[in-house]
Amino acid sequence: MSDDSSNSTHFGYKTVEAEKKADMVAGVFHSVAAKYDIMNDVMSFGIHRMWKRFTIESAGARPGMKVLDLAGGTGDLTAKFSRIVGETGQVTLADINDSMLKVGREKLRDKGIVGNVNYVQANAEALPFPDNHFDIITIAFGLRNVTNKDAAIASMLRVLKPGGKLLVLEFSKPQHEIMRKIYDIYSFKVLPKMGSLITKDADSYEYLAESIRMHPDQDTLKQMMEDAGFEQVNYTNMTDGIVALHKGYKF
């Protein structure tokens, strides 16, 4: 279980008042929004595209479905889902950060992706959608930034249709010691320097590295999803567990 429901929580390695975390996270993403896509490619050596492609394939979206791309940021998953669900379907790109939403909206419109996509500024902990509304929900690299993860998972369960699927793509825990050592050096020595060079903001990427370490590991997140009421929960490790895709169903 998450302990984020108390009056304090973590912001990276810092302990902060729970009600202040959302604003602090917002500051990070306001700062990096304009260069977010570039940094994703650089810091993952482009591998994030493979992780996201696997997520989309695992979702099993079909024409006519309603998909929620939560914490969807600059719209990578939304763009793919929009083509899959077609004119009879709908994709909702939701993010708590208006700077990220603005970048995502402009990017998708420049690609001609309009008509079956709508944009909503929303807090994952209290989603502003009806019960039993979406066929699929994805949250990619967003859950670790949420203050009360249990509340967010419960909110996602509520708005999923019976038979619907949640997919959580998130940084996790490498499975082998040698990979953990390499990953630590890269995350804390190299990544902030990249952030400084590309976005002029080393601190935000230091937070991102710390937030990954504070996020629940694979089995803990699986248990959190089961505790919320998801069934048939499982996960797939990618790149030795640097990233994991968790899947669960609402029945």
From Swiss-Prot:
Which one of the record's GO molecular function terms can you name?
A: demethylmenaquinone methyltransferase activity
Enumerate the residues binding S-adenosyl-L-methionine.
T74, D95, N123, A124
EC number of this enzyme:
2.1.1.163, 2.1.1.201
Q: Which InterPro entries match?
A: SAM-dependent_MTases_sf, UbiE/COQ5_MeTrFase, UbiE/COQ5_MeTrFase_CS
Please give the PROSITE patterns that the UniProt record associates with this protein: SAM_MT_UBIE, UBIE_1, UBIE_2
* UniProt keyword list: Menaquinone biosynthesis, Methyltransferase, S-adenosyl-L-methionine, Transferase, Ubiquinone biosynthesis
Q: What class of enzyme is it?
A: transferase
Biological process annotations from GO: aerobic respiration; menaquinone biosynthetic process; methylation
Q: Does the keyword DNA repair belong to this entry?
A: no
Q: Which domain of life is it from?
A: Bacteria
Q: Which reaction does it catalyse?
A: a 2-demethylmenaquinol + S-adenosyl-L-methionine = a menaquinol + S-adenosyl-L-homocysteine + H(+); a 2-methoxy-6-(all-trans-polyprenyl)benzene-1,4-diol + S-adenosyl-L-methionine = a 5-methoxy-2-methyl-3-(all-trans-polyprenyl)benzene-1,4-diol + S-adenosyl-L-homocysteine + H(+)
Pathways involved: Quinol/quinone metabolism; menaquinone biosynthesis; menaquinol from 1,4-dihydroxy-2-naphthoate: step 2/2; Cofactor biosynthesis; ubiquinone biosynthesis
PANTHER family (UniProt xref): 2-METHOXY-6-POLYPRENYL-1,4-BENZOQUINOL METHYLASE, MITOCHONDRIAL, METHYLTRANSFERASE
Q: What's the protein here called? A: Ubiquinone/menaquinone biosynthesis C-methyltransferase UbiE
Species name for this entry?
A: Shewanella pealeana (strain ATCC 700345 / ANG-SQ1)
What high-level taxonomic lineage is stated for the organism? Bacteria, Pseudomonadati, Pseudomonadota, Gammaproteobacteria, Alteromonadales
